[in-house]
């Protein structure tokens, strides 16, 4: 007998999610008995017992535990089950970790009159051996965080689609491995649902706010028991990326021929209107990478969002435009979405003829498959 699919609030090992109420669930597999007779949930913090239900008739779909949670704390838990046939098994150890309670960081921004999207950076040099490190972050409209240029986590489109006038969710990332050495934390912002247009209106007016904003706080716990907190403030620097246009409907435009922009100090900005909270939305991740096997025809229509891989050869200054043309044979058009441009543009920046090879770029492109063919390779879906 085995106990599998252990979840808290239907999430496997959730990090930084809102936990006003904790609901535990599990599945018993390969049991000889016909039903679960009784179960016991044990919750620990750092090896000490925080809650113990004892053996009782617990609901395997929605069991609750009397537990007062502390912020920034990891709770380990197991569930033991007995069946009517006298079998007994204990699950593997699972966990959930609570979010931040007090923010020392400030909301920061930049000159919003410039179209090139901002990249905020901070040099971090841990002074001792790191035991654990967490990044608590929210960037508006959208953000992607990187450590020494490498993406942190596997999520996209954070902080997702919600009513920013009412609430704004921040995300938590385990950055222990990254902060074992000195490096640069960088955060690139896009327009997203907050700052970009929202709906079929062609006008590029912001829906919730018109300014890029960033709030980030790094907590470092050292092996000697000390802690260090690094938050966004005026000491952070801001430069510009090669992306000068982005939209959840229209994709993005990137020009790698643009000159580098010297970093300047970030500026303090007002907090957004909505209440900041732990995350509720589950991660948006790449679910599949599919090779081309056949051309599909979907009379009913379907919609995909994803990255279009572009292998390109060209000369400096030439532009590649990958577009889904509307309402033409063999192309894609989704009725009712006529305001969606559905194109991605990239400017070459490093090749001159003859070109010995090609490089692949991933362009964010909302791909709409209507009543027609699907002529290009599908690599990832969100």
Regions flagged by a language model, labelled:
Residues 1-382:
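Extracellular/oxidizing-compartment recognition motifs
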């Amino acid at each position: 007998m085995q106990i599998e699919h252990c979840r808290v609030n239907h999430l496997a090992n959730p990090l930084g999610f809102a936990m006003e109420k904790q609901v535990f669930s599990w599945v018993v597999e390969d049991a000889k008995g016909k039903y679960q007779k009784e179960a016991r949930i044990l919750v620990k913090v750092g090896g000490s017992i925080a809650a113990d239900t004892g053996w009782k008739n617990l609901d395997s779909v929605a069991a609750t535990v009397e537990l007062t949670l502390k912020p920034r704390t990891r709770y380990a838990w197991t569930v033991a089950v007995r069946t009517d046939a006298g079998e007994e098994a204990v699950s593997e150890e699972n966990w959930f970790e609570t979010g931040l309670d007090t923010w020392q960081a400030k909301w920061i921004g930049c000159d919003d009159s410039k179209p090139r999207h901002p990249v905020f950076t901070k040099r971090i040099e841990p002074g001792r051996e790191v035991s654990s490190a967490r990044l608590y972050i929210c960037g508006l409209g959208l953000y992607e965080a990187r450590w020494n240029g490498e993406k942190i986590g596997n999520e996209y489109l954070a902080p997702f689609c919600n009513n920013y006038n009412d609430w704004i969710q921040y995300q938590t990332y385990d950055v222990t491995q990254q902060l074992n050495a000195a490096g640069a934390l960088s955060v690139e912002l896009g327009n997203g649902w907050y700052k970009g247009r929202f709906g079929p209106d062609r006008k590029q007016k912001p829906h919730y706010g018109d300014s890029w904003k960033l709030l980030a706080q790094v907590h470092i716990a050292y092996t000697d028991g000390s802690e260090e907190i690094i938050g966004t403030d005026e000491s952070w620097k801001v430069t510009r990326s090669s992306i000068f246009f982005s939209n959840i409907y229209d994709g993005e435009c990137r020009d790698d021929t643009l000159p580098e922009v010297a970093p300047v100090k970030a500026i303090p900005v007002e907090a957004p209107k909505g209440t900041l909270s732990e995350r509720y939305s589950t991660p948006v991740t790449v679910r599949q990478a599919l090779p081309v096997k056949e051309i599909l025809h979907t009379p009913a229509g379907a919609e995909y969002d994803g990255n279009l891989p572009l292998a390109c050869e060209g000369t400096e200054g030439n532009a590649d435009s990958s577009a889904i043309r509307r309402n033409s044979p063999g192309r894609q058009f989704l009725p009712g979405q006529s305001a969606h441009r559905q194109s991605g543009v990239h400017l070459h920046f490093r090749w001159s003829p003859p070109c010995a090879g090609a490089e692949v770029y991933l362009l964010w492109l909302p791909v709409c498959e209507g009543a027609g063919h699907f002529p290009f390779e599908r690599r990832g879906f969100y």
